[in-house]
Amino acid sequence: MKEVIAIIRPNTVSKTVKALDVVGFPAVTMAECFGRGKQKGYFSANLPEIVDIQKIIEEGEKEGRFIKYIPKRLISIVVDDADVPLVVGIISKVNRTGSFGDGRIFVLPVEEAIRVRTGETGEIAIGN
């Protein structure tokens, strides 16, 4: 089993989750997060529109601050090893614009999974 963690733009979460669901991966965990990459928090006019991001930039500029961290979303999904290329491919396809800020995907090993409700373990517990 592997955990696929994706850090993506907030405005692509719905499309990403829907695309994963369509191919049989409905179970995901999501969290709000903030970060920055090579662009170091600077925004470009050619980046896709992100909800409320312009307001955040304007407030930061008024106060003489630069944007240290950009709002992102973290999606985590645990899948069988054989499903990793499919899941990574879907996340990449939905989120790739070719611009800074498209995100990152990490693939980590999972030693064990336990479904608390039933006590099931291993691949049965992830239910994909």
UniProtKB/Swiss-Prot annotation:
The keyword Transmembrane helix is annotated on this UniProt entry: no
GO biological process: nitrogen fixation; regulation of nitrogen utilization
Pfam families (UniProt xref): P-II
Domain of life: Archaea
GO cellular component: cytosol
Keywords in alphabetical order: Nitrogen fixation, Transcription, Transcription regulation
Entry annotated with the keyword Chloroplast: no
GO molecular function, one term: enzyme regulator activity
Family: Belongs to the P(II) protein family.
Functional note: Could be involved in the regulation of nitrogen fixation.
UniProt protein name: Nitrogen fixation nifHD region GlnB-like protein 2
Provenance organism: Methanothermococcus thermolithotrophicus
Classification lineage: Archaea, Methanobacteriati, Methanobacteriota, Methanomada group, Methanococci
